Amino acid sequence: MEICLFPATLQSWTGDVLMVGMFEGKMEERLNELETLCKGSLMQSLEKQMFKGKSGEIATVQLLQNKPNLLVLVGLGEPQEMRLDDLRKAAALGAKASLGCSGTLGMMLPWEPLDAASAARAVAEAVRLSLYKDLRFRSAPEPRSTPTKLELIGLPDSAGKDLQAVHPTCAGVELARQLVAAPANSLTPAALAQTAIQLAHEHGLECSVLERSDCAEREMGAYLAVSQGSDLEPKFIHLTYRPQGPVQRRLALVGKGLTFDSGGYNLKVGAAQIDLMKFDMGGSAAVLGAARAIAELRPKGVEVHVIVAACENMVNGSAVHPGDLVRASNGTTIEINNTDAEGRLTLADALVYTCGLEPDAIVDLATLTGACVIALGEEIAGLWTGHDPLAEGLTAAAEAAGEGLWRMPLPSSYREGLKSNLADLKNTGPRPGGSITAALFLKEFVEASIPWAHIDIAGTVWSEKGRGLNPSGATGYGVRTLVNWICSQS
């Protein structure tokens, strides 16, 4: 889809579908302007549809003239409550109403209260991402028409300075959605590694994959313990973006890569949603999606390392037992008191490996705890870090992306819950504060001198019903936040 600005007036626009945002109680002037397009039928149509401009309301009017042939009005609510995310939601509604149109979609929104460039990028991303549909596994997908061009009406040319980032970023989100949505018999650890290799080949990145024997040589006992219950080989992925010219910052992204999580001998039952545990590699999807975007955007001065310890957590005669002791690659011994707390074990060795790269900052993303979902729900991810500048940078990046992120406490006193009578640590603490003790467990495997942040995306990785610009299913959460954060370091 081509994206461009249309600085001229609404009356001179001649596309196929016109979407206009309307404030509640402030519609009269705009409706009078639109009335000429509808040849007197607009007010009557809106009365029938009971459109008042409330947030989330939508009305459609078929026009008798050739261009445009469909008018879409989307309610924005009260003008004083206007935020960038309201534009995203309105644009997503308008885009979905344009399905069936293969021509030009025009959007007229109240740009002025907000930064024009930020608003243009937010709306363009919302349109592309809301039109996404995964048809890879359909035997006979139905034909589907979407707009081939998006014109943002009433914006000056200067507002287009960030539009070049839209398609690379959205392509990264769509890759993440595809990876998360793929069933576990399709997206195996080997398939995830192949995705990274293909990204490297197509986008000028570097990629290395460590096999089981390589990981054993590095004494990654925690990671390999999780993998030993599966017939599928683990794959430890290291993908690297190197900028042209001198490197000023070296950043590392670590993504949890459990392509399926049965829970192990602490088998997932009841409300544990074992049928959805294909999405337990959502962290790896986010960091690979971000790598895909960064490879095309090519920020200067920033080197980015993407690390994924991919495997399955399954049950067989070789699977790790509850109560087993393992040794991580930094020498820390761990008592596994719950085999369903496996993600932190794989991340432990991944974080130790990443520290060896001497990065200036590490950010890990993981579908780690149900406790985070209980605390923050399905629209906000949790952020744990002891480094204020890193927290501020990630929070600002998430806000600009429209992805919910909330900083959570990391009190050292909660580490008491991880003490073991046999080993240095247990892999789970008491049920209260479970997301905090999970973050504290990970902290044990990060060198104190390296700024580190942990983002728990257990609630945000998947949307059962769909919301805003996210379809039902995989959301691709985290890609846009990571891309914004990395580019801000350039």
Curated annotation (Swiss-Prot):
One of its GO terms (molecular function) is metalloaminopeptidase activity. Mn(2+) 2 binds at K256, D261, D280, E342. Keywords: Aminopeptidase, Cytoplasm, Hydrolase, Manganese, Metal-binding, Protease. The active site is at K268, R344. The keyword Metal-binding applies. Its cofactor is Mn(2+). Gene3D superfamilies: Leucine Aminopeptidase, subunit E, domain 1 (3.40.220.10), Zn peptidases (3.40.630.10). Disulfide bonds: none annotated. GO terms for cellular component: cytoplasm. InterPro entries: Leucine_aapep/pepB (IPR011356), Macro_dom-like (IPR043472), Peptidase_M17_C (IPR000819), Peptidase_M17_leu_NH2_pept (IPR023042), Peptidase_M17_N (IPR008283). It catalyses: Release of an N-terminal amino acid, Xaa-|-Yaa-, in which Xaa is preferably Leu, but may be other amino acids including Pro although not Arg or Lys, and Yaa may be Pro. Amino acid amides and methyl esters are also readily hydrolyzed, but rates on arylamides are exceedingly low; Release of an N-terminal amino acid, preferentially leucine, but not glutamic or aspartic acids. It is found in: Cytoplasm. Mn(2+) 1 binds at D261, D340, E342. It is an enzyme of class 3 (hydrolase). Presumably involved in the processing and regular turnover of intracellular proteins. Catalyzes the removal of unsubstituted N-terminal amino acids from various peptides. NCBIfam families: PRK00913.1-2, PRK00913.2-3. This is Probable cytosol aminopeptidase.
